[in-house]
Amino acid sequence: MGRFISVSFGLLVVFLSLSGAGAGFCCPLGWSSYDLYCYKVFKQEMNWTDAEKFCTEQHTGSHLVSFHSSEEADFVVNMTYPILKLDFVWIGLSNVWNQCNSEWSDGTKLNYKDWSGESECIASKTIENQWWSRSCSRTHYVVCKFQA
């Protein structure tokens, strides 16, 4: 009986360690994962304000995409280009010149930059991993992101 309990406990520990939060994560259906975050491309065009609001309605903690490394930006480019071809997607930066904003719309620190001009809101090209200043009232496609 003692051996059975010991083996059962051992199997339980193995099961819990493999299924626990540290063993991996899953994004909801239709979302792609990268570095503990979930991303989704939406083939809907809207202005920056509506795009940010739209993202917050898609999943708890979701915002317009933020980038914290060139590798992450490359992941998003590789994800968006097959769907949108050569176009722009909104990213979670606005009023960066007028208000000296140093945060993404999700509240994370602006610690990676790839500027290409000045304007109120920033969009990323779906092919070149460059950020372009755009009028916030223009419409672009949307990529949302949240931490898994």
Curated annotation (Swiss-Prot):
GO molecular function, one term: toxin activity
Endpoints of the signal sequence: 1-23
Keyword Magnesium: no
Localization terms from the record: Secreted
Keywords linked to the UniProt accession: Disulfide bond, Glycoprotein, Hemostasis impairing toxin, Secreted, Signal, Toxin
Occurrences of domain C-type lectin (ranges): 34-145
Main location: secreted
GO cellular component: a single term: extracellular region
Pfam families found in the cross-reference section: Lectin_C
Tissue specificity comment: Expressed by the venom gland.
Record-annotated disulphide pairs: C27-C38, C55-C144, C121-C136
Record: glycosylation sites: N47, N78
Superkingdom in the source lineage: Eukaryota
UniProt entry tagged with the keyword Disulfide bond: yes
Subunit structure: Heteromultimer; disulfide-linked.
Similarity annotation: Belongs to the snaclec family.
PANTHER family noted in UniProt: MANNOSE, PHOSPHOLIPASE, LECTIN RECEPTOR RELATED
Record's function text: Interferes with one step of hemostasis (modulation of platelet aggregation, or coagulation cascade, for example).
The protein's name: Snaclec stejaggregin-A subunit beta-3
Lineage of the organism: Eukaryota, Metazoa, Chordata, Craniata, Vertebrata
